[in-house]
């Protein structure tokens, strides 16, 4: 497995170009299964999870080509099963189920894998599809869905706010007969982006980005061209990189209005923030950040995918800060690794109390999930000495060319290729 070797400490400063959002590109790629004409997707990041999704779409009979944009032609889909060998590394594969059963009347997806950060069950996906009229069977590790004719619109009240289940229900309802209303829907910008994509193809979705989404079912979707929105989590990660190192960064091709909760906490930490239509900058003027207290929450609250980065910020900040994780279990697995680098922290249940230290020391550390791996790489950038971050396949799932972008900010980082042994 590849590793990163990071030599610090470094003050990270400069400009970085933000990639397309992984968490929008994935549901949009799966939603392209609904289209009966070719689709061109722009600003799709080059990531392991995107590659896995393209392989999965190809397995189903979809023609997918990458040539700058990603071109998806789902006219000749002739397989309706997402097999275990492709699904096991990526939970997003469940998003194939809704489009398959909506357009073809059948679909089956192996129970998914992905990051080891809690249960994240698929029961809300299943319940939503059943309320649309699908028959669901769990058999031999697969979720199997079928329907005679078209799905039927329904009023669905989500028991719990779920990004994944909101996407599944919304995409399936696009081709359902009648009107579907999703109450207590997730409000993430990536859901709004997926709805905007579907509307480009001829869907009739209103309210995406709020907790009340209405979908007027249509008989078919055509083709179109769509540009994926910028990645707010990547943007936040590079802003934190500058904040923890006393640096200054300008994030270009960003969408600052998706980052309100993160920017508010960075200002609280003492950062000077400036924003434009498609850029955001942070300047620490060489100062240490101040510790902040926060709770993760569904959008528009503080995103769980920025929790690990802010844990690191608190661990090198002035003072002490408390972070409470309300979305996922087991999402403090990076903390013991940071403690090995000299951080002071105490975990109790779903809360971590961070006591800031002036400096971290190098160590060999192991990434456990996508966002935790980013925090360890950033820790290496500011720690004294050479830090080795193992299992970086996690980071390749969600950050496009992160070592190149960090080098552009002055980081001393290299990828050590696996020998294959």
Swiss-Prot record:
| Annotated UDP-N-acetyl-alpha-D-glucosamine binding sites | 91, 120-124, 160-163, 305, 327
Localization (cell): Cytoplasm
Q: Name one GO molecular function term.
A: UDP-N-acetylglucosamine 1-carboxyvinyltransferase activity
Q: Where is the active site?
A: 115 (proton donor)
Question: Which InterPro entries does this UniProt record tie to the protein?
Answer: Enolpyruvate_Tfrase_dom, Enolpyruvate_Tfrase_sf, MurA_subfamily, RNA3'P_cycl/enolpyr_Trfase_a/b, UDP_GlcNAc_COvinyl_MurA
Which residues does the record give as phosphoenolpyruvate binding sites? 22-23
**Cited Pfam families:** EPSP_synthase
Q: Identify the pathway.
A: Cell wall biogenesis; peptidoglycan biosynthesis
2-(S-cysteinyl)pyruvic acid O-phosphothioketal modification sites are: 115
Enzyme Commission no:
2.5.1.7
Q: Which reaction equations make up its catalytic activity?
A: phosphoenolpyruvate + UDP-N-acetyl-alpha-D-glucosamine = UDP-N-acetyl-3-O-(1-carboxyvinyl)-alpha-D-glucosamine + phosphate
Q: Which cellular components does GO assign to this protein? A: cytoplasm
Q: Which GO terms describe its biological process?
A: cell division; cell wall organization; peptidoglycan biosynthetic process; regulation of cell shape; UDP-N-acetylgalactosamine biosynthetic process
Coarsely, its chief localization is cytoplasm
Query: Which keywords accompany this UniProt record?
Result: Cell cycle, Cell division, Cell shape, Cell wall biogenesis/degradation, Cytoplasm, Peptidoglycan synthesis, Pyruvate, Transferase
NCBIfam families the UniProt entry points to: murA, PRK09369.1
What does the function comment of this entry state? Cell wall formation. Adds enolpyruvyl to UDP-N-acetylglucosamine.
Entry's family note:
Belongs to the EPSP synthase family. MurA subfamily.
Q: What is the official name of this protein in its record? A: UDP-N-acetylglucosamine 1-carboxyvinyltransferase
Gene, per the UniProt record: murA
């Amino acid at each position: 497995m590849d590793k990163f070797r990071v030599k610090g400490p470094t003050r990270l400063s400069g400009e970085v170009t933000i990639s397309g959002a992984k968490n929008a590109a994935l549901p949009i790629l799966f939603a392209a299964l609904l289209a009966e004409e070719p689709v061109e997707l722009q600003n799709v990041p080059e990531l392991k999870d995107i590659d896995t999704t393209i392989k999965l779409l190809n397995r189903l009979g979809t023609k997918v080509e990458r040539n700058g944009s990603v071109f998806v032609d789902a006219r000749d889909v002739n397989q309706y099963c997402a097999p275990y060998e492709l699904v096991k590394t990526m939970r997003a594969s469940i998003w194939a189920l809704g489009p398959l059963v909506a357009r073809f009347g059948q679909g089956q997806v192996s129970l998914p894998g992905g990051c080891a950060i809690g249960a994240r069950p698929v029961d809300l996906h299943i319940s939503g599809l059943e309320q649309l009229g699908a028959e669901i069977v769990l058999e031999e590790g697969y979720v199997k869905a079928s329907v005679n004719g078209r799905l039927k619109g329904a009023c669905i009240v989500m028991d719990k706010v779920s990004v994944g289940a909101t996407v599944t229900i919304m995409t399936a309802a696009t081709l359902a007969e009648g009107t579907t209303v999703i109450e207590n829907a997730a409000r993430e910008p990536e859901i709004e982006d997926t709805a905007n994509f579907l509307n480009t193809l001829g869907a009739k979705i209103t309210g995406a980005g709020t907790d009340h989404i209405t979908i007027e079912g249509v008989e078919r979707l055509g083709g179109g061209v769509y540009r994926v929105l910028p990645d707010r989590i990547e943007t936040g990660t590079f802003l934190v990189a500058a904040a923890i190192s006393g640096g200054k960064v300008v994030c270009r091709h960003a969408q600052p209005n998706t980052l309100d909760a993160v920017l508010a906490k960075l200002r609280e930490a003492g950062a000077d923030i400036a924003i434009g239509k498609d850029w955001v900058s942070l300047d620490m003027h060489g100062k240490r950040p101040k510790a902040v207290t926060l709770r993760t929450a569904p959008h528009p609250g503080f995103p769980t995918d920025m929790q690990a980065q802010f844990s690191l910020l608190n661990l090198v900040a002035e003072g002490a800060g408390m972070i409470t994780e309300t979305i996922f279990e087991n999402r403090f697995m990076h903390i013991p690794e940071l403690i090995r680098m000299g951080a002071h922290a105490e975990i109790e249940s779903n809360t971590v109390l961070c006591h800031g230290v002036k400096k971290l020391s190098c160590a060999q550390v192991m990434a456990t999930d996508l966002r935790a791996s980013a925090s360890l790489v950033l820790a290496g950038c500011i720690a004294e000495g050479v830090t080795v971050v193992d299992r970086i396949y996690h980071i390749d799932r969600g950050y496009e060319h992160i070592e190149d972008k960090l080098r552009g900010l002055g980081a001393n980082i290299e990828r050590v290729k696996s020998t294959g042994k």
